[in-house]
C-alpha cells in the first residue's frame, strides 16, 4: 500500500477588465447613442475600469495505491487520486469568470485491474475512470460560411471511462518491445453555449455527452527496440490513432491513421553521440486535429461541406533527420 498527499497555498492578484472588446474600445468613459421615439438622439454614458481580483485559496491532492499478489506472478492492483485547483490567472483572458463562476476544479481518478509478471513479460490491464469539473475555456464560435466570430466563456465538465492493456516484453537477449492498447470514451458534460452575431442571428452549440474533439477512442502503441551492440541500437515506433472528431458537435471527423517512426542511435564515446531517424516511414497522407471555424456545424449540416476546402492540421510528411550530441 502507498499513500500520499499535498497541500498548496494559491494566491492570485490582478487587475481585470471584464468588459468585452468592441471597435474603438478604450479605458474610461464613453457614450452610446440611440434614437428615441420622438426622433431625438439619446446619449448613454458608460465607463470601463480595471477592477482588482484577489484570491487566497488552498489546492489539495491525495493518492492511495493498493497492490495484492495472488501468486508470485499474478495479482490485483488499484489506485485512486484526487487533485484540485482554482482557476489560474491565464483563464481570465477575455472576460474571465465572474465571482459566481469562480469554482474549484476537481480531478478524480480511479482505476483498477490485474497484472502478470515473469522473466520476459510485464503485463497489466486496467479500467480507468477520470473526470474534470468546472473546466474553463474561451471558445471562439464562428458563424458558418463567414469570417465573423464571437468569443464566449464556457465552464463545463469532462469525464472518461477507458480500458488500457500494456506490456513490456523481453523475449530474447538485447530485444525489448513496448505494446499498449487503449479504448476510451471521453465525453463533454454540461457543454452549452450560444452567441448572437451582428445580423441578429443567434446560434448555439450543445456538445453535452459528445466525444471530446481531437481525442481518439482507440489508441495503439508498438515500440520495438534492438541493441545491436552496447553502444548501438535500432528502434521503431508505431502509433495508431482511431477516428477523431474535428469539431464539438461530432459533425466532422478524421479517419483513423498510423504515425510511424524509426531510427538508429550510436553512442560513439563518452562525449559524442550520433543518430538518424525517419518520420512517417510509409509516407501516409492525411489531416488531423480540428477544423477552424467549424464549432457551430451540426451533424445535419455536415453534408453541405462535402468536397469543400477547410483548414486544419496535416500529418508530417516523410522526413529523414540526422542528429549529433556533444558533451563537454
Predicted feature residues:
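Membrane-embedded beta-barrel scaffold of Gram-negative outer-membrane proteins
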Residues: 72-81, 104-161, 166, 170-176, ...
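Hydrophobic, aliphatic-enriched repeat segments that assemble into extended interaction scaffolds
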Residues: 1-17, 120-121, 169-183, 266-282
Amino acid at each position: 500500500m502507498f499513500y500520499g498527499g499535498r497541500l498548496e497555498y494559491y494566491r492570485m492578484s490582478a487587475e481585470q477588465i471584464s468588459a468585452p472588446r468592441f471597435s474603438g474600445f478604450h479605458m474610461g468613459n464613453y457614450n452610446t447613442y440611440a434614437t428615441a421615439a420622438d426622433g431625438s438622439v439619446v446619449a448613454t454614458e458608460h465607463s470601463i475600469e480595471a477592477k482588482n481580483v484577489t484570491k487566497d485559496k488552498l489546492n489539495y491532492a491525495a493518492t492511495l495505491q493498493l497492490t495484492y499478489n495472488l501468486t508470485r506472478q499474478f495479482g490485483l492492483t488499484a489506485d485512486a487520486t484526487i487533485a484540485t485547483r482554482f482557476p489560474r490567472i491565464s483563464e481570465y483572458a477575455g472576460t474571465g469568470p465572474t465571482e459566481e463562476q469562480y469554482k474549484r476544479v476537481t480531478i478524480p481518478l480511479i482505476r483498477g485491474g490485474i497484472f502478470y509478471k515473469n522473466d520476459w513479460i510485464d503485463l497489466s490491464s486496467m479500467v480507468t475512470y477520470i473526470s474534470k469539473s468546472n473546466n474553463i475555456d474561451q471558445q471562439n464560435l464562428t458563424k458558418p460560411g463567414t469570417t465573423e466570430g464571437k468569443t464566449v466563456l464556457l465552464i463545463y465538465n469532462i469525464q472518461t471511462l477507458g480500458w488500457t492493456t500494456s506490456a513490456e516484453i523481453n523475449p530474447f537477449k538485447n530485444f525489448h518491445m513496448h505494446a499498449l492498447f487503449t479504448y476510451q470514451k471521453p465525453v463533454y458534460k454540461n457543454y452549452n453555449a450560444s452567441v448572437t452575431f451582428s445580423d441578429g442571428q443567434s446560434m448555439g452549440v450543445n456538445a453535452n455527452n459528445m466525444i471530446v474533439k481531437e481525442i481518439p477512442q482507440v489508441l495503439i502503441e508498438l515500440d520495438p527496440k534492438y541493441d545491436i551492440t552496447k553502444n548501438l541500437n535500432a528502434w521503431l515506433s508505431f502509433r495508431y490513432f482511431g477516428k477523431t472528431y474535428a469539431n464539438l458537435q461530432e459533425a466532422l471527423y478524421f479517419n483513423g491513421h498510423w504515425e510511424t517512426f524509426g531510427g538508429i542511435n550510436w553512442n560513439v564515446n563518452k562525449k559524442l553521440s550520433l543518430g538518424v531517424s525517419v518520420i512517417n516511414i510509409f509516407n501516409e497522407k492525411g489531416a488531423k486535429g480540428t477544423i477552424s471555424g467549424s464549432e457551430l456545424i451540426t451533424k445535419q449540416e455536415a453534408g453541405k461541406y462535402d468536397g469543400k476546402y477547410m483548414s486544419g492540421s496535416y500529418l508530417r510528411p516523410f522526413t529523414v533527420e540526422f542528429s549529433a550530441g556533444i558533451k563537454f
